[in-house]
A protein has these predicted regions:
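N-terminal Lys/Arg-rich, disordered targeting/topogenic segments
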Residues: 1-12
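Periplasmic-binding protein-like
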Residues: 24, 320-327
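A bilobed periplasmic-binding-protein/Venus flytrap-type ligand-binding module shared by bacterial periplasmic
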Residues: 259-261, 265, 271-323
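Hydrophobic membrane-insertion alpha-helices, especially the h-region
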Residues: 14-39
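Extracytoplasmic/secreted proteins, especially bacterial periplasmic and envelope-associated proteins
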Residues: 63, 67, 95, 99, ...
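Extracytoplasmic "Venus flytrap"/periplasmic binding protein-like
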Residues: 92-231, 235-236
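Composition-driven low-complexity repeats that form or flank extended alpha-helical/coiled-coil segments
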Residues: 238-247, 251-255, 259-260
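Early extracytoplasmic/lumenal segment of secretory-pathway proteins
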Residues: 42-120
Length: 327
């Protein structure tokens, strides 16, 4: 039997109708897939809340994931947040930097749990004694300053400084105002929806409902800020001064919020975010114990989140404090 492949035989094969039909079907499938990809509504950075867990911590617990799910389903966030994600760097191994950088560059980062502990990678010997050049907060600041908010309430351009200015634009004085400028909020909301061509708010009915949710969002931010100020004043949490140097640049500011400066008031935090500390027992043996002492949170400024939606981070942190603090 002659099984030689020739141009004539190939031409005959391609002329079969069934092959043409299959080819047309494949082409149509690719075409519709392309159309769907180009027109599908994508989740914007402001609609996704992402929590990072530093590699020095223990892996995120089941309690943490349950609580984050409850926060999303409940009323912790505003209407804008529709999904939550996590990046647990304890599982990244040697790819920590790659994973972190890739997420930051596409604006998928809101807060990070990070302990105020010495960074072993900065160890050095002096007079026969091991010392450390930095703790984890300082090391992280040195490498990621451009992605972090300064949390100092009095520093212009900082997270809480700008939040207070944002709220005062609607309240006059956010601390003691009894009314809120709902008309201004609605106007700003409608202008933003039009500018962004937001498909969620096309009809007048959708816009009216969205404006009401926007008013509630601003009110949430105000309530959360006042609560946090109370927590700081009472010593439940505390701002951490962090100083670091990168090349010729010196950084100094309140770049972290210590969620557990006192275990008597925030020890429950260890159910959600924790690290292992060495404890020497009466028998002289070392064991590891789960703790959240000096567990901090840093706020990411990824620039991709639309103005004012970065304050969803505050809503989550206040929720966590209220969940964990001692009664």
């Amino acid at each position: 039997m002659d099984a030689k492949i020739t141009k004539t035989r190939i031409a005959h094969m391609l002329s079969y109708d069934w092959l043409k039909i299959v080819g047309l079907a494949v082409a149509l499938m690719l075409f519709w897939n392309l159309i769907f990809t180009m027109t599908a509504t994508r989740v914007r950075p402001s609609q996704q809340f992402t929590v990072f867990n530093h590699q020095a911590n223990r892996p995120l617990s089941e309690d943490f994931f349950n609580d984050l799910g409850d926060a999303l389903q409940g009323d912790t966030f505003s209407y804008e947040v529709i999904e939550t994600t996590t990046n647990d760097l304890t599982e990244a191994g040697e790819y920590v930097s790659i994973l972190l950088d890739s997420r930051l560059k596409i604006h998928e980062a809101d807060v990070m749990f990070i302990p105020k502990l010495v960074d072993p990678s900065t160890a050095y010997e002096e007079n026969g004694e091991t010392k450390y050049k930095a703790n984890y907060l300082q090391s992280f600041l040195r490498s990621n300053r451009s992605y972090l908010y300064d949390l100092d309430p009095e520093k212009e351009g900082g997270y809480f400084y700008e939040l207070k200015a944002y709220l005062n634009g609607y309240y006059g004085n956010y601390k003691n105002a009894e009314t809120i400028d709902e008309e201004k909020i609605e106007k700003d909301f409608r202008d933003r929806a039009k500018k962004n061509k937001d498909k969620r708010f096309k009809t007048e009915e959708q816009l009216a409902l969205g404006a009401q949710k926007e008013i509630e969002r601003v009110q949430k931010y105000r309530d959360a800020l006042i609560k946090l100020e109370g927590f700081v004043e009472s010593g439940i949490v505390a701002f951490e001064e962090v100083e670091a140097q990168s090349m010729e640049y010196q950084f100094k500011g309140k770049f972290a919020l210590n969620l557990c400066p006192n275990k008597d008031t925030m020890d429950e935090l260890k159910k959600y975010a924790s690290y292992s500390e060495k404890v020497v027992g009466e028998d002289g043996k070392e064991t590891l114990r789960k703790t959240a002492k000096d567990m901090c949170v840093m706020f990411f400024d990824t620039k991709g989140t639309e103005e004012s939606f970065e304050y969803e981070s505050l809503l989550y942190v206040v929720h966590l404090i209220e969940t964990c603090r001692a009664a």
